[in-house]
Each structure stands twice: as C-alpha cells, then as structure tokens.
C-alpha cells in the first residue's frame, strides 16, 4: 500500500532479489506499466548496480515506487517529480546522485515544492528536510557526451529533448551497451535539443506518447499566441 513506503526502514523491506544476476538484470521498482512513479535497478554479474530515476506519482494520495535496495549510485534522467521525487530518501543509503548540472539545479526547486505540497495536502512523505539537504549535497553533475565510471561500467549522458537538462543514459557494461531513454522528444524545441539515436545492444524506451500523433508545433505556437493576445 501507499503508506508502507513511509514507514519502512532503509534496506529492511526491499523486495529486490538477494541473489546475483546471471547476466544483466533490470528490476523495476515502478513505472513499468504506468506513467510516472519511475525507478529501475540495473545490475550485472560484476556486482555493479545502479538505480535509474526514483520518482513518485503526484496523485492524491501520492503513489510511491517499491523500496530501493542499497545502491551506491543513482542516475536521474531529468528533474520532473515522477522521476526524482523519491531521490532524497536515497540519502539513507548514502547514494551518489548523477545527472546533468541543470537537473541537479532544478531538483532543489522540485523537492522543496514536493515537501511543501505534501505538508499542505496532509500526505505523508518518506523523506524530510534533512534528507532534502543531504540529497542536494550528494549530486555529481556531468556534461553531455562525457564519460564517467559507475563501478565496472562506463556511462555518459545524451540530450533527450523533453525539458532542459533531460538526458538519455548510455551504459557500457562488459556484456552489452544499454541505452535508457528517459522521457524523450525527437523534435527540437526552443528550450532543449532533440534526442538523436545512440547505438546500443539493449534499448529501454519510454512509450508515453507511442500511440499518439502530436499536433504541429508551429501551429500550436500560433494558437497559443492568439489565445494570449
């Protein structure tokens, strides 16, 4: 249930498998069959383990992901609350947060707002202000197209479109190259360059608008301006 998220102690009630994977394992904590509430553990037989995103769905009441196992590293694709909303809780594990500098900067605003809204609406939150401060201190920002190491893996971030600072994550493991798309937009916008293909062996792709055709951006901008004026 939703309340169990608030009561659990770090690492004590996670459903994450205790045995080492035979190959590459993707274990979803949320977001696999839903929009938002995202979190996925990727681990291989080397023992390297990383958490991709850790959000909450800002519904009433909020919907929380399953409890994360201890992780040394988490990579945040972008600063929307359904992708980073639970990240301050990870400070119980001493987790290092990776992302773009813009995602790190915007996270402070998003977390402060989440804390304020939960207080106003009276919904319990699994982290407090001390966790928020610790999470801000745990960021390690990265530039696009710059390699960094996570355990035995090499990782780098690529522009994802969507919102400023949003990133796709390329992960080179000894067995395969994984691309985690995060939320993407394949069209340029005034605020963010579009996502472009990255060669990989395993593609983890979001499908929020997979079955929908978006209206033409120029027409939408004209319609917006005419409404305002």
For the regions a protein language model found, what residue spans apply to each?
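Extreme N-terminal basic, low-complexity initiation segments
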Residues: 2-5
């Amino acid at each position: 249930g939703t309340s169990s998220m608030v009561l659990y102690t770090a690492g004590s009630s996670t459903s994450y498998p205790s045995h080492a994977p035979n190959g590459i394992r993707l274990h979803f904590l949320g977001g696999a069959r839903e929009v938002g509430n995202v979190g996925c553990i990727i681990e291989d037989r080397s023992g390297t383990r990383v958490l991709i995103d850790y959000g909450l769905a800002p519904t009433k009441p909020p919907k929380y992901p399953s409890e994360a196992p201890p992780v040394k590293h988490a990579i945040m694709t972008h600063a929307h609350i359904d992708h980073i909303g639970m990240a301050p809780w990870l400070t119980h594990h001493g987790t290092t947060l990776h992302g773009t500098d813009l995602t790190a900067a915007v996270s402070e605003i998003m977390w402060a707002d989440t804390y304020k809204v939960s207080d106003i609406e009276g919904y319990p939150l699994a982290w407090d202000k001390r966790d928020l401060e610790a999470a801000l201190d745990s960021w390690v920002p990265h530039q696009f197209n710059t390699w960094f190491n996570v355990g035995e893996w090499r990782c780098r971030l690529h522009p994802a479109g969507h919102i400023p600072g949003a990133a796709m994550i390329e992960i080179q493991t000894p067995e395969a190259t994984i691309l985690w798309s995060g939320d993407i937009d394949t069209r340029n916008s005034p605020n963010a360059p579009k996502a472009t293909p990255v060669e990989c062996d395993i593609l983890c792709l979001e499908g929020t608008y997979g079955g929908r055709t978006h209206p033409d951006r120029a027409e939408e901008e004209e319609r917006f301006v005419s409404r305002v004026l």
